[in-house]
Regions:
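Alpha/beta catalytic barrel-like cores
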Residues: 7-127, 136-139, 144-147, 158-165
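Conserved, mostly hydrophobic/aromatic
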Residues: 131
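Eukaryote-skewed repeat-based solenoidal scaffolds used as protein-protein interaction platforms
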Residues: 147-194
């Protein structure tokens, strides 16, 4: 069932009665344009350029992360109110987490809010997904590309693990690009298997 709604200048359609037993569920991909247009804006992809991290310090970066995660909670609540049961999370939740050029930081400061996201995912039966970028190429013949891919996929998996600790495990999934075949399909498949 489709419902037409208007919020301010925005007109949107809600698909109602989403549930586990439906083969296809539509959802939001990283950004809610209605919430983003609010003042202050609600969005979960705040970033910092490396120079800003160096100048302002890792604590400024962590504050961006916490605001991203607080806004994920807000978006999940909005999704629940509007019958949306699938929500793709932005890969930018933790800027530079897998970037070797930026000082390492851990997830400890964000553990509680990640658990809260997991609890909401479970309570709302809201599927949370990550879809790491196309530059993640598990089958690449280049060692450096493969290592960076592993680092980035580990980042995404770690975030989903923390969400799962909060109860969202059955609803937390990662979708990975298969990538190219690099001129030798069998060798690429073997690299994937390794």
């Amino acid at each position: 069932m489709l419902t037409q709604n208007i919020l301010g200048n925005f007109k949107y359609t809600v698909i109602c009665n989403m549930s586990d037993n439906k083969p296809i569920q539509l959802g939001l991909c990283c950004l809610n344009t209605i919430l983003r247009a609010q003042k202050p804006p609600v969005f979960a992809s705040r970033k910092m350029i490396i120079r800003s991290v160096e100048e302002q310090g890792i604590d400024a970066l962590k504050e961006k992360v916490l605001q991203n995660l607080r806004d994920v909670v807000t978006m999940m609540d909005w999704n629940e109110q509007h019958g949306i049961k699938v929500f793709r999370l932005s890969s930018e939740l933790f800027p530079h987490m897998s970037n070797p050029k930026v000082e390492n930081y851990t997830y400890d400061f964000a553990r509680d809010i990640l658990h809260e996201i997991g609890e909401r995912s479970n309570r709302y039966n809201q599927r949370l997904t990550f879809h790491p970028g196309q530059y993640n190429v598990v089958g690449s013949p280049k060692a450096e590309a493969f290592e960076q891919t592993c680092s980035d996929l580990k980042y995404h998996a770690d975030v989903l693990d923390f969400i799962s600790e909060g109860g969202g495990g059955k609803n937390a999934v990662m979708v990975v690009h298969g990538g190219g075949i690099y001129g030798d399909k069998e060798a690429t498949i073997n690299r994937w298997c390794e």
